[in-house]
Amino acid sequence: MSVVEGARVDAGAGEVPARLDGRLRLVLVVLLVAQFMLAVDFSILNVALPVIGDGLGFSLSNLQWIATSFALCAAGFTLLFGRVADLFGRRRLFLVGLAVLGLSSLVGGLATSPEMLIAARVFQGLATAAGTPARLSPLPTSFPDRPSRQKALGLIGALMSAGFTTGAILGGVLTDLLSWRWAFFINVPVALAVLFIAPTVIKESRPATRPKLDVPGATAVTLGLLALIYGLTQAGEHGWGAPSALGWLAAGVVLLIVFYAIESKSSAPLVPVSVLKKKTVAWGNIAGLVAFLTETSLVFLMTLYLQEVLDFSPLTAGLSFGVLGVGTVIGGSIAPRVIGAVGTRSTLIVGGVLQAVATLSLVALGETSASMWLLLVATFAGGVGNMLVIVGFMVTATTGLPDHEQGMATGLATMTQQIGITMGTPIMSAVAAANTDIHAGITTAVIVNTAIVVVGILTTVLFLRTKAAKDVAAAG
């Protein structure tokens, strides 16, 4: 049955969501812990960057590479590793990714030079790219019935967004109370625990027919994404008109066009063009891109507001996002029931509208702490709405595909998440920096953020329609 149009999300008529038995709950806990840990790594160092720069001797111009080196690898290599998971085993790649993440986190915490730290961040990004699609693609075999899989997708989606928010909080707490090095060290025991438990509870899975690795396509899409994301970081640092930004963005677009052309002719494409043409895949991923781009960049804007306008400490600013984290967890927890009641398309629309209204209300923030009540209420409501969209996107973009394409589909969905996280901050930073008054710049960026959410709603309303629902039903 359809998961897009107003149909209920059931495996059969009248079916209610399945209860998870003890083993499935343990599998889900392992996947959730890994998801949360990888999501935290996207933002945990943000508030600690000045302290790290002073401690290791980073120049101001090179400080951005602590975040950029991680984001480039995490987003740029995700699709490639999604297919590698199909080739060599999803559980195997999941475990390898976790091991590399734990080791690189240890190296990062022990870093004594900028080069050593950047190398650790590169391997953290690669581990994230390897671990994320490999972690999500076992869902069809671990949770073969649709209701239990939707529960898992809802919780995993919630943890992705909540982990990003928690990273901002945790980074401030660890840096303020202990040392920035603990932002790295905290990954090590978690990775070891998951590595100890995962082999006993997660089944190995790979397609029945071993697919070939599309080397030209993999090269084109990886280089294209790297160029595109690097161009966005250059735009955030130097402005949208900077030659370096325009050059890298143009190169990224050209390479992605080349990738599409390669996939159209390949006998064993990395991403079958027929899959990309499915409305559920295409527009579901567009909705996810908008959700992650806007909410994570809003955290950046509100961090800027709290520290630069209200003069809060990094610790206080980080703790202020606790209500946003609660909102995302609640939104992710109720999303499967909302989808079951009204369908994925309506859930995407309702969540988007709630997020847009909550975000737009932030234009009323003043220059005193009296505005904190508005920030807390708006970020909570926006977090709930954002998670409805994220879970709706995950269900839409990964449902109705055969098992041998699950690694690719989850790789696409994960790449969408990570590109959204990577794109958001440079875009909003460039918008905010265009105004010499920091408060006015933040207000303008909030309006732009809201407009992007509205565009996401409109694409869902206009393009994710009945035909897409039939496509999913036919494929499922």
Q: What do the predicted segments below correspond to?
A:
Residues 2-200, 342, 348-356, 360-367, ...:
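Transmembrane-helix bundle of Major Facilitator Superfamily
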Residues 3, 475-476:
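Short, intrinsically disordered, low-complexity terminal/loop segments
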Residues 15, 33, 89, 134, ...:
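Residue-level signal for pocket-adjacent positions within structured domains
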Residues 24-40, 45-49, 60, 126, ...:
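12-transmembrane solute porter fold
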Residues 55, 142, 204, 234, ...:
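Generic structural signal for alpha-helix termini and adjacent loop/cap motifs
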Residues 76, 130, 193, 223-226, ...:
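Residue-level signal for the membrane-embedded core of alpha-helical transmembrane segments
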Residues 154, 176-289, 294, 312-313, ...:
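Hydrophobic transmembrane-helix bundles of small-molecule transporters
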